Amino acid sequence: MAANIQAYLENLQQPWGQIYYDILFEQLKDIKGKRVLDFGSGFGLVANHLAQENQVLAVEPNEEMVALRTQDHPYQQLVGSLDQLESFEDASFDVILCHNVLEYVENRKAVLKAFIRLLKPGGLLSIVKPNEVGR
């Protein structure tokens, strides 16, 4: 297992890792009956949580993370990145999540443009990016 993936798994077991997801799930609790794109889905924790009451499509470029993903609830998982976004129809998602991903993306502008194209009018775009200064 890659060292960065092992470190992330270990972080999830720490109190701050658990608190992060508790807070996040509380903030996302009202998302129900929506078509959701989880871009950069990692281990599928958020996709799995939202799949309880939504139709979720998860996209993750790291095959090792996809192999270790959580899937207690049905959601579609694709391996890929920006290339996968190009295959979806305009205005096809009510909610797009991009959590802790943009710092790893080379062409952020292209990804954000794709989100604009894919998001339905009045849809929700949720972006989380760590503050590097605060780390």
What are these regions (language model features)?
Residues 95-107:
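A short SAM/SAH-binding and catalytic strip from SAM-dependent methyltransferases
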Residues 1-32, 34-42, 45-49, 65-68, 124-135:
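Conserved class I S-adenosyl-L-methionine
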Residues 109-124:
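A short glycine-rich, Lys/Arg-flanked "PGG" loop and its adjoining helix->strand segment in the class I
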Residues 43-84:
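Class I SAM-dependent methyltransferase SAM/SAH-binding core
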Residues 86-95:
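A short acidic, Gly/Pro-enriched loop at the edge of an enzyme's catalytic core
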Residues 38, 60, 103:
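Class I SAM-dependent methyltransferase core
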